[in-house]
Amino acid sequence: MKVALIAPLTQGAGPSVVGASLRNAVDMAVNETGPGDITVLVKDDHGTADGARAAAQAAVSEGAELILGPLFASSVREVGRVAKAANRPAIAFSTDASVASRGVYLLSFLVESYVDRIVEFAAQKGKKSIAVLAPENDYGNVAVGEMQSVAARTGIRVMAIERYRPGASQDAVKRISQVAGQIDALFIPDQAESMNVVGKQLTTAGVDPKKVQILGTGLWNDARALNVPALQGAWFAAPENAGFNAFAARYRTKYNSDPTRIATLAFDATTLAIALARSQGPARYSEGVLTNPSGFNGADGVFRFKPDGLNERGLSVLQIGAGSTTVISPAPRSFAGGPT
């Protein structure tokens, strides 16, 4: 049987590091699980929506039963149209939840999952009131919307939501400081490289991280966040690093280079495709099999697909301190019923 990988193997005039990492991860999965079950058709979408559409059409015409990828949201939309017309499912790698749909599943690390985990954990730890300091970008928009939903569900009061243009956070920080005495948590869904500046501004404005628990997302699973003074003691949600570190060590041995962080998505998608081919017979890539509520185990932990194409992941909560992270709430190892 055949599955297809659609990835940006080339972009512009040259090869793509990300695309090469995804392709290598697919090869690793095939080699580690043993040959003979599937043939992977590798298709280059050139990082464009048109290229992705053409790649999907070629994959379907060559007999692919399942499409893995692509990476970019615009490409996922085009692949989804082709795949649905051919009654083929796709497991894509975009972080844009809007491109998920029935039959087009996202394996990526979604903002929504990070927000759900960290805000629910804060509520479990007795946090009652929260403020939000978020960049005015797509990531911030999704994070704020999801935080409001989780806060309503868990009973946390949202005392303030302040937005800022990336690189221009000072005024928003000042406004947050005015409610610092009324909150016990501050959620900042911004990237690690921004936090040195934002952190200094919070300190200058008098926001004490010893009194206000700082919360973040998997964007802080980055060395640049670990030595920011204002983030010492901060909590954030992310996959546990052990699985990726083990994968990366094997990858380095085989390819003499480091994988991109998202390489495990291609590895897990391929491993899943092979496992289902071996265990599920003709129904291997049906909706009922792919949306098994018990989920599946991958390099980054347990995950499952929802019928709407989104995913749920077992995430840990980590605390920053002294240039490293400590797991303070381990990722669940299974969903109800246990993973496949």
What do these predicted ranges mean?
Residues 1-340:
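Extracytosolic ligand-binding ectodomains
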